[in-house]
């Protein structure tokens, strides 16, 4: 990811774009392309607002966003290779049974790992809240 992503919230990081209030434009996090709020953008013969245009741009130009983040932020994420692969399968919409068959494990093992990811996400959310409280002191 480009520099400065630390100031963005988790929704902005996940969707891959944010609104720059100073420049009055939507910005793609991956390539920093700007979509001026006052402009109308053409995609595939249709016209879109800047926000919709940056969404379409993100899907078309950066469809591998999850994989890219998993690769580039290995140190921060602290995930094993198998965990990264599981997350990519979850994102692709594969069922627990399909994933289990591919990995040669039981579906309950996959369900347990999904549970572990949810617990880790809850922990991260609470950690962020605590850190914000500490910084406000």
Question: Which sequence ranges carry the predicted segments?
Answer:
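Short alpha-helical "packing" element that flanks the helix-turn-helix/winged-helix DNA-binding module
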Residues: 83-90
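DNA major-groove recognition helices of helix-turn-helix
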Residues: 110-124
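Short, basic, alpha-helical segments at the C-terminal edge of helix-turn-helix-like DNA-binding modules
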Residues: 126-137
């Amino acid at each position: 990811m480009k520099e400065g992503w630390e100031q963005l919230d988790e929704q902005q990081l996940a969707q891959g774009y944010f609104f720059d209030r100073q420049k009055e434009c939507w910005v793609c996090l991956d390539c920093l392309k700007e979509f001026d709020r006052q402009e109308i953008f053409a995609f595939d013969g249709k016209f879109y607002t800047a926000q919709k245009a940056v969404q379409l741009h993100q899907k078309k130009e950066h469809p591998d966003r999850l994989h890219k983040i998993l690769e580039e932020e290995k140190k921060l994420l602290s995930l094993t290779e198998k965990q990264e692969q599981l997350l990519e399968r979850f994102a692709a919409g594969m069922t627990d049974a399909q994933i289990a068959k591919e990995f040669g494990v039981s579906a309950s093992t996959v369900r347990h790992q999904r549970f572990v990811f949810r617990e880790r996400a809850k922990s991260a959310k609470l950690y962020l809240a605590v850190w914000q409280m500490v910084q406000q002191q």
